Amino acid sequence: MAPLLGTLALLLLPWIARGADAGAAPPYLPRKGLALTLWAREPEVADPVALNFDDQGRLYVAETARRGTVDIDIRSHPDWLVDDLSNRSIDDLRRFFRTRMSVAQSEANARWLPDHNRDGVHDWRDLMGIQERIRLLEDPGHSGHATRSTLFYEGFHEEVTGVLAGVFPWNGDVFATVYPDLWRLRDPRHTGTPVAVESVAHGFGVHAAFDGHDLHGLVMGPDGKIYFSQGD
């Protein structure tokens, strides 16, 4: 990884960078002795939630499309609350969603659930119509900004899947947190494409709860253990 040489490269979130003039003043001033430069922006990266560098200076970004679209928020369905609180497992939650968003209730669902999979029915299958992404950004020429953007992985879209809210590369693996799982994506040769995707821990988030209150802050601790926070 190239030395920083007193320059701070910042990945600006889309709500800052979108539509902004590239020559405009930065949104805030860095500390004295540092320079603020744009490292990546749309369309190279979009809707970032979390990011982490690997030991080769490559940046992995968790991008969400499910947040605010198909990640159910119990506040929008107060009549579901009591039944939702009775869920004790992901299988319970899956059955609950399939009951509340059945084909028979398509007309009622249409008031709030778009036909994401375009099958003419507003049901639980529409929750599977939008996928999450892990983006890989690189600066192989050490130019000071990302010159290569590739899609590392796209998926995580079952009806019970929440928001991809954590990503952490480690020793040829890329770990990702998205309700209801902690995932490991194997890329031992650092090709930029996983050769295997497996759930290493399952069962988080048995209630609909609040949209976006998911599994965040994925890190490797000094003891070699994986840590992350869990929302409601």
Question: Where do the model's predicted regions map?
Answer:
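Bacterial N-terminal signal peptides
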Residues: 3-15
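A compositional/structural signature marking long, glycine- and acidic/polar-rich segments
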Residues: 1-2, 231
